[in-house]
């Protein structure tokens, strides 16, 4: 039996490719080196008069392809990229975040680090990492600093410093959305939408203009210990298609409220304090508090799911 030169060369290539991928090693002119190595092996076999078997040739080709993939950016190891700005660099009091993720979860939260304005982190467990997949761009208009974050494959994490007026607009194709903003009373508006994935928000605000949570295939969960409206008929909308919808909120006085809930196939459970209930069936709920027509600040709250259950707990902030 002849020595399996080609199989040994292919195995060596696989080992090198694996080590490079695991360590994140970047081999500068690896494309040219692969061609040189492959040509040298073929010449050696020709000079030795060795005729490789099909299995040996297959191992060698797989090794070449693996090393080529690693050299062009394919990686099985985790990757993380972070962008940030300090308060000194920013010099704006109102921040508006627009986050779009095709495949990957999005988390939004706050930090007590005194000089941090914002931090955006992209993390990828493994896969194709090509230039332009993750982008962060900014613009300014009317005294508002607008930050647009876009990702194709990565999970996105956004941290914001305290003391800013904030708008959040987040969309994911496949991936959950989590917003943790307890005690962040400067939030102005929130819009979170996931096509496939859950939407979870913990939001406190004393001057809210809109709060919209939507999910096509996934549950929706909203918790708030203080919601105050910044104007009349401020929408608070939770809209799901297939998943359950859960809402537990405490509203500021003396805001007026119109609250409705509905489901096509599921059921509704409710625990309302301080409301006048006009309709309460298995699939529909309607209630009001205060005079919506004359109130300077008021909410229009809607919770609905086409195929899931709806759970509504609502009352008013004590005092």
Where are these regions (language model features)?
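Right-handed parallel beta-helix
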Residues: 169-206, 212
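Histidine/glycine-enriched, metal-chelating micro-motifs
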Residues: 18, 39, 102-104, 154, ...
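Extended Gly/Ser/Thr-rich low-complexity repeat segments
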Residues: 155-170
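Membrane-interface segments at or immediately adjacent to transmembrane helices
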Residues: 73-144, 154
């Amino acid at each position: 039996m002849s020595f399996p030169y080609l199989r040994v060369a292919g195995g060596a290539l696989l080992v090198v490719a694996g080590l490079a991928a695991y360590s994140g090693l970047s081999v500068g002119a690896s494309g040219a080196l692969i061609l040189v190595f492959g040509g040298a092996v073929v010449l050696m076999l020709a000079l030795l008069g060795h005729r490789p078997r099909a299995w040996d040739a297959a191992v060698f080709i797989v090794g070449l392809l693996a090393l080529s993939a690693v050299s062009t950016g394919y990686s099985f190891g985790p990757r993380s990229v972070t962008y940030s700005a300090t308060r000194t660099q920013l010099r704006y009091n109102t921040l508006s975040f627009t986050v779009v993720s095709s495949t990957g979860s999005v988390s939004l939260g706050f930090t007590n680090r005194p000089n941090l304005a914002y931090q955006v982190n992209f993390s990828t467990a493994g896969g194709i990492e090509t230039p332009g997949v993750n982008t962060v761009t900014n613009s300014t208009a009317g005294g508002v600093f607008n930050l647009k974050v876009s990702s194709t494959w990565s999970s996105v994490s956004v941290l914001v410093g305290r003391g800013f007026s904030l708008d959040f607009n987040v969309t994911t194709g496949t991936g959950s959305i989590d917003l943790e903003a307890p005690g962040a009373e400067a939030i102005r508006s929130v819009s979170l939408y996931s096509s496939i994935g859950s939407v979870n928000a913990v939001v406190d605000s004393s001057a809210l203009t809109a709060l919209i949570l939507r999910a096509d295939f996934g549950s929706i969960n909203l918790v708030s210990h203080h919601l105050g409206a910044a104007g009349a008929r401020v929408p608070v909308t939770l809209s799901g298609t297939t998943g359950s919808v859960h809402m537990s909120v405490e509203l500021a006085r003396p805001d007026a409220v119109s609250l409705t809930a509905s489901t096509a196939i599921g059921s509704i459970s409710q625990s309302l304090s301080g409301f006048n209930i006009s309709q309460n069936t298995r699939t529909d709920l309607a209630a009001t508090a205060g005079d919506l027509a004359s109130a300077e600040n008021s909410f229009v709250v809607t919770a609905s799911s086409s195929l899931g259950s709806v759970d509504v707990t609502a009352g008013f902030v004590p005092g």
